[in-house]
Amino acid sequence: MISLSIGQGEIGATPLHLANLAATIANRGFYYIPHMVKETPDSLLNNKYREKHFTMVEPRFFNDIIDGMHLAVNAAPGSGGTAARAAVKGLDICGKTGTAQNPHGKDHSVFICFAPKDNPQIAVAAYIENAGFGGTWAAPIASLLVEKYLTDTTSRAAMEKEVISWNLLGNVPVKKR
C-alpha cells in the first residue's frame, strides 16, 4: 500500500488518465468524461460529454495542491522546483513531474500540467518512455504544447530546437529531415 502512494506497484494509468487528473485538479474537483472527436458541430456533441462530474473532495482542498504545482514550475532558481524547464513567462503553468521506474531499462519521464493557474484552458500529460526524469524530458515537451495552444506560437526557440533534436526512440532508426 505504501508503494502505491508514490506511484509504484500495481497501479496503471494511461496518459489520458493523467491528463484528466490534471484537468480535475485545475477545475478544483470536477471533470468531464474524456472523449475523442475528430470533427462535429458543437450542437451535436452528446450531452453526456457536457455533464460535469464531481469528485468527493471539496474544492477548497485543491488550492494547496495547485499552489504546489505552480511552485514546481515557477519557483525561484535553486529552490527545488522540479519542473523549471516547463516555465513560460506569463502563462502560469502548474505541473507535476514524475519518473516512472522501469525494471527493464531506463526510467520513463512523466509530466502533467495545466494552464493558466486561475483560469485553466488546457491540461496536458506527457509520458516519454525510457527518457529518464520528468523535469528533464516530459516537462519541456508539455510546456511547448501548452504555450502553442494558448498563444499560437512558441517564445523559446532554443528549447524548441533542443526538443526537436532529441532522439527519444532509443535504437529505432530515425530519418533526419
Regions inferred by a protein language model and the residue ranges of each:
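Short, highly charged C-terminal tails/helix-capping segments
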Residues: R156-R177
